[in-house]
Amino acid sequence: SLSDKDKNTVRALWAKISKSADVIGAEALARMLTVYPQTKTYFTHWTDLSPSSTSVKNHGKNIMVGVSLAVSKMDDLTAGLLELSEKHAFQLRVDPANFKLLSHCLLVVISIMFPKEFGPEVHVSVDKFFANLALALSERYR
């Protein structure tokens, strides 16, 4: 679980990087689609899966809206993200393993874009946050 220190670390980083959330989301999604090509199966309705495509950029933005919501609901992610969990489980039918893949890509992009802010201690806290976020999004799969 997240300690108070972890939560404060994540909130402090989010305050610094949230202005770039759209770019982070699009870059992370594009990276996931490239590095883990099996994830493309959820986006077969898109004609262009390239990093510069409008669809990738828009969905990257939506992902980061969800991350922002998670930051604001960090004290109870399971309850705070219940609607998102239901949507991904029942409507979109996303394999919950993909949340971990995307989390990894988000960590990579944040570390590239914000190397000074993303030291080892921050990395640990953000990684724990994303693990808890993935777990909360997987809640309705049980």
Swiss-Prot record:
InterPro entries in the cross-refs: Globin, Globin-like_sf, Globin/Proto, Hemoglobin_a-typ, Hemoglobin_oxygen_transport, Hemoglobin_pi
GO cellular component: blood microparticle; haptoglobin-hemoglobin complex; hemoglobin complex
Gene Ontology molecular-function annotations: haptoglobin binding; heme binding; iron ion binding; organic acid binding; oxygen binding; oxygen carrier activity; peroxidase activity
Coiled-coil segments on the chain, per record: none
GO biological process: hydrogen peroxide catabolic process
Residues the entry annotates as binding O2: H59
Pfam families registered for this protein in UniProt: Globin (PF00042)
Tissue specificity annotation: Red blood cells.
Keyword set includes Disulfide bond: no
Gene3D superfamilies per the UniProt record, alphabetical: Globins (1.10.490.10)
N-acetylserine sites (modified residues): S1
Residue ranges constituting the Globin domain according to the UniProt record: 1-142
Keywords, ordered alphabetically: Acetylation, Heme, Iron, Metal-binding, Oxygen transport, Transport
Amino acids binding heme b: H88
Family (UniProt): Belongs to the globin family.
Subunit structure, interactors included: Heterotetramer of two alpha chains and two beta chains. Can form polymers.
The protein's role, per its UniProt record: Involved in oxygen transport from gills to the various peripheral tissues.
Other comment: Displays a strong alkaline Bohr effect, and at low pH exhibits the reduced ligand affinity and cooperativity that comprise the Root effect.
The protein, known as: Hemoglobin subunit alpha
